[in-house]
């Protein structure tokens, strides 16, 4: 006897936010199931809350989404929800995601009830419970919004008579994985396998999910994000020019995405397009600063400096904001270097002089590096300065020289 069990366990798409709605649905399902376990399976209450074709109501159609026939039924649904929920919630937003989830579940229960009334009237009083219709709706939405993704699966092949149990892990394109699931569901429906399972709810839920995805305009978003996914896959395989082409296509429609700009800059560096790489790095940093993400801007500035070498300088305002950001983030060495780069690039400006002073002060007071501070003060002293500024520079230069002498005497 041969059995093959498979279960999705993840996707290759990024989730950048905490999926609060998905977590809330998971916890609500667990709480409701725990309450019924604590009440030792109150069948009367469960039956009253469950959706039935003979007595279809909006309230029971929604309540049934949080009721399950048993622990395995619950766990199976929550596994699917945990795979498909977070990436969709991150892209649809909490409100649209919750509405789509509940609507697919409600409509799929109505579809199951209609099928029972039409073809299996003897089942009109059998309760319909479970979140399968809603989760099937998420799978339909996934086909529209994230059709380019890959799904990760685990499987177990059982050969009972031979005593063999073989686990495996594999991945499939989402269209193939979900398509196989739909095909099996359809086959089970016609074959009458596990007839107590609401296969019509599964199939109709997926259909409603596809319809909702198209109505919400998710297809254009999907085509755009596909460029990022393909670019990432090409880059992982070392196909740099193909990857860069995908990012270029994406940026043609979303030119202000700092992460895509940064990735394109890295690819241009790898393909020896240093000039274009610098332009893209600078634009990515500017976009991070506009978004108020100073940490990412500072990190990318340092990455740009390492990859491109030399004196990396941003436009005036951006360079100062990055220098201040590095200082506020507790990275004094990098901040001093950024201030110094500004001071050298914009030497003819008053702010350039102040930036050099700031750089030297960080070296002297924070990093306890009077030698480096002296070098910067000496460079400043060679510039034409106003009387007050020149006096400050001379005074701090003298203090640095004394500190260097003390270090030398201590070393001796």
Positions of predicted regions on the chain:
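Start-of-helix register in tetratricopeptide repeats
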Residues: 225, 242, 259, 279, ...
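Short solvent-exposed coil/turn linkers within tandem alpha-helical repeat scaffolds
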Residues: 250-257, 290-291, 307-314, 342-352, ...
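TPR repeat positional signature
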Residues: 227-228, 261, 281, 301, ...
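A detector for small-residue-rich transmembrane helices and their helix-helix packing motifs
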Residues: 1-251, 259-267, 276, 283
């Amino acid at each position: 006897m041969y059995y093959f069990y498979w279960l999705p366990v993840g996707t290759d798409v990024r989730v950048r936010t905490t999926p609060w709605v998905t977590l809330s649905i998971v916890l609500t399902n667990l709480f409701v199931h725990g309450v019924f376990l604590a009440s030792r399976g109150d069948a009367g209450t469960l039956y009253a809350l469950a959706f039935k074709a003979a007595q279809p109501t909006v309230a029971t159609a929604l309540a049934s989404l949080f009721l399950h026939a048993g622990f395995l039924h619950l766990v199976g649904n929550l596994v699917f929800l945990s795979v498909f929920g977070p990436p969709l919630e991150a892209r649809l937003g909490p409100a649209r995601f919750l509405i789509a989830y509940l609507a697919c579940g409600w409509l799929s229960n109505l579809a199951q009830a209609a099928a029972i009334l039409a073809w299996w009237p003897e089942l009109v009083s059998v309760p319909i419970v479970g979140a399968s219709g809603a989760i099937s709706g998420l799978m339909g939405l996934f086909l529209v919004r994230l059709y380019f993704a890959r799904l990760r699966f685990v499987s177990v092949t059982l050969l009972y008579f031979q005593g063999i149990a073989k686990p495996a892990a594999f991945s499939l394109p989402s269209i193939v994985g979900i398509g196989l699931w739909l095909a099996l569901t359809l086959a089970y429906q016609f074959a009458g396998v596990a007839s107590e399972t609401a296969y019509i709810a599964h199939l109709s839920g997926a259909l409603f999910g596809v319809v909702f995805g198209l109505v919400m305009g998710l297809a254009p978003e999907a085509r755009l994000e596909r460029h990022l996914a393909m670019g990432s896959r090409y880059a992982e395989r070392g196909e740099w020019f193909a990857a860069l082409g995908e990012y270029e296509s994406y940026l043609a429609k979303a030119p202000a995405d700092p992460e895509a700009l940064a990735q394109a800059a890295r690819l241009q560096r790898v393909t020896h397009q240093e000039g274009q790489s610098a332009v893209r790095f600078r634009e990515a940093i500017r976009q991070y600063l506009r978004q108020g993400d100073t940490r990412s801007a500072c990190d990318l500035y340092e990455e740009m400096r390492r990859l491109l070498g030399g004196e990396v300088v941003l436009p005036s305002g951006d360079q100062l904001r990055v220098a201040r950001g590095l200082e506020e983030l507790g990275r004094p060495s990098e901040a001093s270097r950024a201030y110094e780069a500004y001071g050298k690039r914009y030497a003819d400006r008053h702010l350039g002089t102040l930036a050099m002073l700031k750089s030297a002060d960080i070296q002297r007071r924070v990093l306890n590096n009077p030698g480096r501070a002296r070098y910067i003060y000496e460079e400043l002293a060679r510039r034409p300065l106003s009387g007050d500024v020149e006096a400050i520079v001379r005074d701090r230069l003298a203090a640095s020289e004394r500190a260097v002498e003390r270090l030398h005497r201590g070393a001796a």
